[in-house]
């Protein structure tokens, strides 16, 4: 072997060895994924700030991933839709490469439901200039959480070099969101703040256009120059040997490289400048280059670098020169190492000499050490208080104080004092205006013919867990399984005090939609207060919940016939069921009324075979199951009927084993209540499984599913005189007759008549909560709220709960009063659904906010309220009955006994 050949082999081996060694100098973002300190509290509370918070219990310090402090997360004070200006800021104190973020909603041990389905990120390296993070395709929005408890990790491609990071939660409608976060990455030891370079160019090849631009650069672009930012040359991604290929998926040819043609640079070099965070001693610069010389890409012919210590200083001395020569041998991409000789500086200017048609770089990194000279150290970035970062920095003076530099604005103390006084005066004027407004409201109420007691006006968008006022007093309450974050100013673990109903009426955000003019109370003389009614509870603001009294006499002694209103209101308790909100509001029972424990009708769990999940909620799920060998269970213990050859379908409500103690107690109470219901048009409790977890209750389920889906799949027969013969087939599919629709409505009225005799209030009567069995048998159920299919029928109130406002009487929406009369209103809407064959949602032309405003029109009673239109198949007489169901005055609505009698006997005569 000749000497020349041996020398060539040694040179090639040296180049490969140097290239491999130099590759180790480029950081690997895959190894830069350490938690940066939110969860383990390495990041102190003082370095976490927010634009606003709902209360102290949802302040910035509670935003740590997997933390359950306070109310369980950071929750902004206002809605994030549509402006998306609320943010959570984390100060990392030093530059870090952030490669991954984790988010979580507010779970709070099962009490919270708020989370953010998507969010944006902004970041800053100096506290002054903020950049929007974008992925490699220019998208800013990051998908977030689908539930409040799960942690969702998102890779950031490209990663961002930042000291301060802001999370901006997003929503597609007005709703509450809460957030917990963690950042993952590592310390940015390069210290590179920005680089300045010519804009990358496009290479025209015969088969493809190769775009060699810096697509992730986060600085400015002007005059063919990119400056003030970082991009692909500092993202840790090293290009492949063939620059037309890429490490990333779904990107264009040349994505990994930034390149320039020598034809565009008559000087024969590309000049770049690099700015660092502080004064450094530079040992080596490593540049990863492409050398696919068959397509024109060559290594640089040489590199010249100069240094300076400050932005206003001149470049120091002679440049450091390093000749490379541009290899025509090995076409593989490689990292070249440029020795910098230990020069000191904070700014570098490097010129890369062309040795061929193109220069292509994918990564540039530096090996350097920080100079421990405080006089030359670049000061750390200022910390900005919550709010938009200032845009004019000419008047800012940086004063380090301890470990936290602050931005101090030069200003006159007199101006600050005047501003404070103006703010105080405006606040006092606002308080006076609110007091006058409240006083005027009280006068209006006192002048009305029918007095509405303040304690009766618990006027807010009522949720299923709210107090329901019966006989002007709240029913006994259980601690709700879902709790919204405590109001601002309320100390932890204290119950919010409700001063009076008028204040709630005036302060309710939803009610602001309604007060275009002053409302007046309902007209007509009010009924005298029954002598047996207890006085209004004056301790409603105590920290404890009321317990039901233990009467020795019957719960509700019958009053004189002429002393009660048309609809009596009973003492009730509300239960939070498996799915987070049971629909029934039921009478408060004296001890021993239904036994001390759940009925001992233990259903054999092994006989249940899962078919599908009907719905789910906060504390459990509702499953559709089939009972195996049901004929063996036919006995007095299990009220089931089995038809030979037909499977027995049941609905199984399952309580999660980790449910709270309150949820378990409510579950057992619901079992007791359900065991009292025995009516052919109400679903029955067939049995329970309470010996071990998970607790289950088994109820009827009908083979034809819910009434909404059943009717929407059918057409109305043309012959209105068709008898009760059921379904028939036509060319358009199954049909249903008008008499059968009346039969359906009569069965619903019959079931509700039975509930009314027990003083049960359903609160969510709709076709989605009615089940259809054999021969058009209708049974009223209560788990429609848990089904995702009907999520659009419910309105979320400030992230707290969901309400079927399109079916609710105006007094339910505005005053939280649920009575049998409000169920009559919902029955009228349900009957409208039946006659429309469930083709349309009630008030489908109105938004949710307009429906609430329409409830306000009923309250004001100025003739501007909107009613549901008459269905095409509905006779005028029947429509007039429906309008009576929607009477403004609850006592003017027909009772269910009258509704059932009309639909069962008289309705056909009106056709």
From Swiss-Prot:
Gene3D superfamilies the UniProt entry points to: 2.60.120.1190, Galactose-binding domain-like, Phosphorylase Kinase, domain 1, Transferase(Phosphotransferase) domain 1
The enzyme's E.C. designation: 2.7.10.1
Tissue occurrence: Detected in the cochlea and the organ of Corti in the inner ear. Isoform 1 is predominant and is expressed in developing embryo and adult brain. Isoform 2 is expressed in various epithelial cells.
Chain residue ranges for the region called DS-like domain: 193-369
Span of domain F5/8 type C: 32-186
EC top class, as a word: transferase
UniProt motif (PPxY motif) ranges: 479-482
Membrane side Cytoplasmic: residue ranges: 437-911
Free-text description of this protein's post-translational modifications in UniProt: Autophosphorylated in response to fibrillar collagen binding.
Summary of the knockout phenotype: Mice are born at the expected Mendelian rate, but female mice are dwarfs and most of them are unable to bear offspring, due to defects in blastocyte implantation in the uterus. About one fifth can bear offspring, but for these the mammary gland fails to undergo proper differentiation during pregnancy, with hyperproliferation and abnormal branching of the mammary ducts, leading to a lactation defect. In addition, mice exhibit hearing loss, due to alterations of the inner ear. Mice display poor calcification of the fibula.
Keyword annotations: ATP-binding, Calcium, Cell membrane, Disulfide bond, Glycoprotein, Kinase, Lactation, Membrane, Metal-binding, Nucleotide-binding, Phosphoprotein, Pregnancy, Receptor, Signal, Transferase, Transmembrane, Transmembrane helix, Tyrosine-protein kinase
Subunit (UniProt): Homodimer. Interacts (via PPxY motif) with WWC1 (via WW domains) in a collagen-regulated manner. Forms a tripartite complex with WWC1 and PRKCZ, but predominantly in the absence of collagen. Interacts (tyrosine phosphorylated) with SHC1. Interacts with SRC. Interacts with MYH9. Interacts with CDH1. Interacts with PTPN11. Interacts with NCK2.
Name of the protein described by the UniProt record: Epithelial discoidin domain-containing receptor 1
Gene name, Swiss-Prot/TrEMBL: Ddr1
């Amino acid at each position: 072997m000749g000497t020349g050949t041996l020398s060539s082999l040694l040179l090639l081996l040296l180049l490969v060895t140097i290239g491999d060694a130099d590759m180790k100098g480029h950081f690997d973002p895959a190894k830069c994924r350490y938690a940066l300190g939110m969860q383990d509290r390495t990041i102190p509370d003082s370095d976490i700030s927010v634009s606003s918070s709902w209360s102290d219990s949802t302040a910035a310090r509670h935003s740590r991933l997997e933390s359950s402090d306070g109310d369980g997360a950071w929750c902004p004070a206002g809605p994030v839709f549509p402006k998306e200006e609320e943010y959570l800021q984390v100060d990392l104190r030093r530059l870090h490469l952030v490669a991954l973020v984790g988010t979580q909603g507010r779970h709070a041990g099962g009490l919270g439901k708020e989370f953010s389905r998507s969010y944006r990120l902004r970041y800053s390296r100096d506290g002054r200039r903020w950049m929007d993070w974008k992925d490699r395709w220019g998208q800013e929005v990051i998908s977030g959480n689908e539930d409040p408890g799960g942690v969702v990790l998102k890779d950031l491609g490209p990663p961002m070099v930042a000291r301060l990071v802001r999370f901006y939660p997003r929503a597609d409608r007005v709703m509450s969101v809460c957030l917990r976060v963690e950042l993952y990455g590592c310390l940015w030891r390069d210290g590179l703040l920005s680089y300045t370079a010519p804009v990358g160019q496009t290479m025209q090849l015969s088969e493809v256009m190769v775009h060699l631009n810096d697509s992730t650069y986060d600085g400015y672009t002007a005059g063919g120059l990119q400056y003030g930012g970082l991009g692909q040359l500092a993202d840790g991604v090293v290009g492949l040997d063939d620059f037309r290929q890429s490490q990333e998926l779904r990107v264009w040819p040349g994505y990994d490289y930034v390149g320039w043609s020598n034809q565009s640079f008559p000087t024969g070099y590309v000049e770049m400048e690099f700015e660092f965070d502080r004064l450094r001693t530079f040992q080596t610069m490593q540049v990863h280059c492409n050398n696919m010389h068959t397509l024109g890409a060559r290594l640089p012919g040489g590199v010249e670098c100069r240094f300076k210590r400050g932005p206003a200083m001149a470049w120091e001395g002679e440049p450091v020169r390093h000749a490379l020569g541009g290899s025509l041998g090995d076409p593989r991409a490689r990292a070249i190492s440029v020795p910098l000789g230990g020069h000191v500086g904070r700014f570098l200017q490097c010129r890369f000499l062309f040795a061929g048609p193109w220069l292509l770089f994918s990564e540039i990194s530096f090996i350097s050490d920080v100079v421990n000279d405080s006089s030359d150290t670049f000061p750390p970035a200022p910390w900005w208080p919550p709010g938009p970062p200032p845009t004019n920095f000419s008047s800012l003076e940086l004063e380090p104080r301890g470990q936290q530099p602050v931005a101090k604005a030069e200003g006159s103390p007199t101006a600050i004092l005047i501003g404070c006084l103006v703010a105080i005066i405006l606040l006092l004027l606002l308080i006076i205006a609110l007091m006058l407004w409240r006083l005027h409201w009280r006068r209006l109420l006192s002048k009305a013919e029918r007095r509405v007691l303040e304690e009766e006006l618990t006027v807010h968008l009522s949720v299923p867990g709210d107090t329901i006022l019966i006989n002007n007093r709240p029913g006994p309450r259980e601690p709700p399984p879902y709790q919204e974050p405590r109001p601002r100013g309320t100390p932890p673990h204290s119950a919010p005090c409700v001063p009076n109903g008028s204040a709630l009426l005036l302060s309710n955000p939803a009610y602001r939609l309604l007060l275009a003019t002053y409302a007046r109370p309902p007209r007509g003389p009010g009924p005298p207060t029954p002598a047996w009614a207890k006085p209004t509870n004056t301790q409603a603001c105590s920290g404890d919940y009321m317990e039901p009294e233990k009467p020795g006499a019957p719960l509700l002694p019958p009053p004189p016939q002429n002393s009660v209103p048309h609809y009596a209101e009973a003492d009730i308790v509300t239960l939070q069921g498996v799915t987070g909100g049971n629909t029934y509001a039921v009478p408060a029972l004296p001890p021993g009324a239904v036994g001390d424990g759940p009925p001992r009708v233990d259903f054999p769990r092994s006989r249940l075979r899962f078919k599908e999940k009907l719905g789910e909620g906060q504390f459990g799920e509702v499953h559709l199951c089939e009972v195996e060998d049901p004929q063996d269970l036919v006995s007095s213990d299990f009220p089931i009927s089995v038809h030979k050859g037909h499977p027995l379908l049941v609905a199984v409500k399952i309580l999660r084993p980790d449910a709270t103690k309150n949820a378990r107690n409510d579950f057992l109470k619901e079992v007791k209540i359900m065991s009292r219901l025995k009516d052919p048009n109400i679903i029955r409790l067939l049995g329970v499984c309470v010996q071990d977890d998970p607790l289950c209750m088994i109820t009827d389920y009908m083979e034809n599913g819910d009434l909404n889906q059943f009717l929407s799949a059918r057409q109305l027969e043309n012959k209105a005189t068709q008898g009760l013969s059921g379904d028939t087939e036509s060319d358009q599919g199954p049909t249903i007759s008008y008499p059968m629709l009346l039969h359906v409505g009569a069965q619903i009225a019959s079931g509700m008549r039975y509930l009314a005799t027990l003083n049960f209030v359903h609160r969510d009567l709709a076709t989605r909560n009615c089940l259809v069995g054999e021969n058009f048998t209708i049974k009223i159920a209560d788990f429609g709220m848990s089904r995702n299919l009907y999520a659009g029928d419910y309105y979320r109130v400030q992230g707290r709960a969901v309400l079927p406002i399109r079916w609710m009487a105006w007094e339910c929406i505005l005053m939280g009063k649920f009575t049998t009369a409000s169920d009559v209103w919902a029955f009228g809407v349900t009957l409208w659904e039946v006659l429309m064959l469930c083709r349309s949602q009630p008030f489908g032309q109105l938004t949710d906010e307009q429906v609430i405003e329409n409830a306000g029109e009923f309250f004001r009673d100025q003739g501007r309220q909107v009613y549901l239109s008459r269905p095409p198949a509905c006779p005028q007489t029947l429509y007039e009955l429906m309008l009576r169901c929607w009477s403004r005055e609850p006592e003017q609505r027909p009772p269910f006994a009258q509704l059932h009698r009309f639909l069962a006997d008289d309705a056909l005569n009106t056709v």
